[in-house]
């Protein structure tokens, strides 16, 4: 089954506790507008953890899927306290939504 952008938008509400989908507007976490295709820890107006700065990846669907499954296992020392999205279909939906934010 294909990823569902609308379901991802609904699921993103959990992310929106700490992140925005608006360019240049950060909360506790960085804005996720344009995150797909962006290098990790690359927004100038956000203070990333040292762990995220060292992660040194470009956010694509595969990297996001792995990270969203268990953020602290992928980037030990990340400031992100969200435990992750265990359901693969839900992660795919969120990623499909994130891909629309450009």
Task: Identify the residue ranges that each predicted region occupies.
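Detector for the c-type heme attachment site
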Residues: 19-25, 37-38
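Short cysteine/histidine-rich zinc-coordinating motifs and their immediately flanking basic loops
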Residues: 27-33
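Short Fe-S-cluster ligation motifs
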Residues: 44-63
